[in-house]
């Protein structure tokens, strides 16, 4: 699995490409961009998906994530998919990349598990760590962009990309975090994977 520095370098490369490349192929690639809140999607799958492997180990986070992304891509048919994960140290060291978005944010509530797998908290944390590691390995084999920046949370990066980088693209933000609704405009829409609903500018007015 690549290190955080590798993912940071990939993000810098991504910014350089989207800002400097003007080829028609790149333009088409950025026509309809799906940007996914990675940890939000993983935690949701981990909490509610009871899938087990042949050894009886819980793999709901991994399976739930992949199924959710596949379903969303089938529905929205993006030309490009970007998955953003919280960077190491993101929570205690919040960086205000897009101040207008951060100004009116509410504190996020902790996700409650809907199913008890009968595991101790430390075992649950280890399971999450192992599933996340395997998930990243799988995602790196797919034609999508993975982004994680140390000391920066995923929602900051998603807001920055949608408002400051891909300014000519139709953007679909995938998350259950209602704070993203602040970003909805003529270009930016929010897809709720739990409600299977697309929030447009007209829908939230």
Regions found by a protein language model. Name each.
Residues 2-20, 24-174, 180-198:
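Noncatalytic, basic helical substrate-engagement surface that gates or grips nucleic-acid strands
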Residues 197-205:
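A short, charged helix-loop
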């Amino acid at each position: 699995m690549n290190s955080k520095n590798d993912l940071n370098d990939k993000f810098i490369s991504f910014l350089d490409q989207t800002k400097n490349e003007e080829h028609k192929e790149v333009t088409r690639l950025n026509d309809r961009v799906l940007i996914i809140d990675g940890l939000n999607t993983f935690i949701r799958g981990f909490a509610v998906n009871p899938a087990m492997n042949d050894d009886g180990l819980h793999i709901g986070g991994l399976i739930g994530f992949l199924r959710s992304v596949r379903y969303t891509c089938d529905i929205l048919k993006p030309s490009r998919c970007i998955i953003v994960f919280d960077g190491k140290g993101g929570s205690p060291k919040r960086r205000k990349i897009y101040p207008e978005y951060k100004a009116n944010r509410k504190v996020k509530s902790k996700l409650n598990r809907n199913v008890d797998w009968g595991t101790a908290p430390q075992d649950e944390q280890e399971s999450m760590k192992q599933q996340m590691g395997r998930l990243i390995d799988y995602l790196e084999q797919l034609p999508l962009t993975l982004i994680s920046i140390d000391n920066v949370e995923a929602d900051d990066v998603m807001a920055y990309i949608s408002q400051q980088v891909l300014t000519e693209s139709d953007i679909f933000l995938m998350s259950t975090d209602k704070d993203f609704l602040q970003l909805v405009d003529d270009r930016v829409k929010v897809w709720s994977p739990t409600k299977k609903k697309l929030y447009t500018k007209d829908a939230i007015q």
